[in-house]
């Protein structure tokens, strides 16, 4: 996971989180971070992910991974900033076609010794009953924790 270069509390500010929907909006966000000398969070929304996958394609996983790959490549040209990638506000109807497949993809990355593509995913359970919201949150958290546990164990083995 990227380590931000300076804690926001040191400067009395918070990390900005910018939703991007294309290479153009991503470039604008990165330039803004660089100009402000601020690390930041790049957020990909459900609509942005569908759009980036191709006109009429609407494959949110493809769009998310494509925009994330572009973000990693271009952000590397701004050595004074660190970005984190985040999927933003995933409602229940998009879990099976967006966040769950991304979590599976990232579990495969971690199993191969790679860092996950995204640093966070936001489950938005605001439209479902509280019990269902908490059950889904627990399931998603378990998947993320399992991947983090594998990564931690891999790192420990690598240090011996």
Mark where each language-model region is:
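N-terminal amphipathic alpha-helix/helix-capping segment at the start of soluble metabolic enzymes
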Residues: 1-16
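Acidic, proline/serine/threonine- and glycine-rich low-complexity intrinsically disordered segments
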Residues: 5-9, 72, 148-155
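Divalent metal-dependent hydrolysis catalytic cores, especially in the metallo-beta-lactamase
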Residues: 15-18, 43, 118-121
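Conserved, mostly hydrophobic/aromatic
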Residues: 19, 29, 88, 151
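Short helix-capping segments at alpha-helix termini
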Residues: 35-36, 76-80, 145-148
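Active-site beta->alpha loop and helix N-cap motifs at the rims of alpha/beta catalytic domains
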Residues: 46-137
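Conserved anion-binding
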Residues: 126-160
